[in-house]
Curated annotation (Swiss-Prot):
One of its GO terms (molecular function) is DNA binding. It comes from Listeria innocua serovar 6a (strain ATCC BAA-680 / CLIP 11262). Effects nucleoid occlusion by binding relatively nonspecifically to DNA and preventing the assembly of the division machinery in the vicinity of the nucleoid, especially under conditions that disturb the cell cycle. It helps to coordinate cell division and chromosome segregation by preventing the formation of the Z ring through the nucleoid, which would cause chromosome breakage. The keyword Hydrolase does not apply. Residues 143-162 bind DNA. Its main location: cytoplasm. This is Nucleoid occlusion protein. GO terms for biological process: chromosome segregation; division septum assembly; positive regulation of sporulation resulting in formation of a cellular spore.
Amino acid sequence: MPFSRLFGKKDKNQMDDIVEEGVQRVLELPMDKIFPNQFQPRTVFDQDKIDELARTIRIHGVIQPIVVREMEPDYYEIIAGERRFRAVLSLKLEKIPAIIQNLDDEEVAAIALIENLQREELTPIEEAKAYRSLLDMQDVTQEALAQRVGKSQSAIANKMRLLKLPETVQEAVLNKQISERHARSLLALETEEQQVSLLQEIEENHWNVKQTEARIQEILGVKKSVATKKTKPKRQAISRDVRIAMNTIKQSVTMVKDNGMDLDFTEEETDDFYQITIQIPKKK
């Protein structure tokens, strides 16, 4: 089955048709012979929802079989249905109904991503890592990936920018300690130390996004200091304006790079001025 077929499907029923293509029968497989999907983009599972599903399975059984592929003789990897698998595991049942499919790594990764996107259950970090994994495996552009998963190219790029944040910040998003908008605002800061430090302030003060952005502007020197020192006010204003201009240029360059353009950025400071050189190679 061509990998492109998976990316071309946006309707859940169409995805189910692909997963179940060529199915001959449902088997009862031993639970201890099944292991989770190595390409599962979701790393955080809602235990309450799994417990609720387990209660339903206890009464009605597993109505929809999981889908697996055989990795070694009598050992299987889950392709779809990990929540059902976890629910059955919590019930300490010995077997689970399953359908065996022959799919390669790229197809399995695509199914796992699209299935979760359709259910809107991924955190922003999980989604970003899934995009990166698919880009690495398939060697496609962000634009091509966006078309195949039904997203805009800018949405893909913005999600993947979150992976530039320190692991501590990514974990906070993953665990829903801060929102995606909080995390995105932290990208304006220049160092990881600043980002981690501000994360601590956000959590300690329970700041919303607007308050966080205001604090970032203070850090970047856009807002006037609380202190009202009047020594050399003109020089301070000019210095502040220069910082604003420099930060604006740097952020613009970063945005262009994130959108896939290859360019070189150099910065030089003299006694009289800052010199910025941007080189964009001509396409041959």
